[in-house]
Amino acid sequence: YWGVWHGSEPFTAYRSHHYRFLSEFGFQSFPALQTVKRFTEDGDRNIFSRVMEMHQRNTAANGKILNYISQTYLYPKNFDELLYCSQLLQADAIRYGVEHFRRFRGTCMGAVVWQLNDIWPVASWASVDYYGNWKALQYAEKKMFAPVLLSCEEHGEIDQKPFVNTLPHPIDVSADLHVANETGEPIVGTVKWSLCRPDSSVVKEGAFEVNAPAYGGQWMPHLDFNGQDPLEVHLTYELVVDGNVVSSGSTLFCAPKHYHFADPKLSVSVDGDTVTVTAENFAKSVSVETENGVLRLDDNFVDMEAGTKTFRILPTADFTAKGTGVSGAYRVRSVYETAER
């Protein structure tokens, strides 16, 4: 199914289809700036430059990425932020599909994402670039394909009024949570949810008991948030089993470009192989990077509420944690920092 991407359909279009098995679907993104620097000079770093278009197999795809960015994010303030936004788009596109297909296990019994890696440094459908750097999609796929997944089918402007200049009409602001269980044992636990404001203060919260059958799934009771401003609230959720969070996520009810983010004032510190990120407000798609782009973490490109979140550096052939506790070599960003505000 290539309606999303080649057909320029919105990500929510996946939810109109209930395939038995999906043999191929995907979405493009650019590699990180550190990879792009290896095949460009300063004057080439524009997505419509000759060099950037030559490093693109799909005709007119760079413009397609920009079109999807315009539907989702404020205009990126520079070339680097545009590359970053493209990776967030790619991860969200595939997540919309995979989570939907997993919510209807029994109808859909499998899906194959196009594609894993690249044979040259290029903008592509890959989740791992030519140099082995993980894009946002690769981190997201670790979670969306995990044996146990808590996911959310949200309803709001995203699926009912994606274009703000259409005639006013009522918007259903609600959510349906689902636990997918691909293990051979029932999953017994608790789903906890919180409806939060941009400053991470809680509007309302609740919990549901879960008993998801082996190789099956379970829908949670419908969550009705009508009366809430979709630009001012977001939903966070987690599945707790035996005291451990085994799956979690968050969702907006409008496009990120319209959400009323508060400045998260992100900061990062490093101690050995432990990276700690601090946020003063809700931050979406938080990414920690190094200047040379070879940092690999146990998780990245994550949403986080106000507070701290820790990540672990995973040593690779090009990188070891030893002697890397110099904060100046690291940077952290989120959707908030991608645009001039």
Model-found features: residue ranges?
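Long, low-complexity ectodomains and other extracytoplasmic segments of secretory-pathway proteins
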Residues: 143-164, 245-271
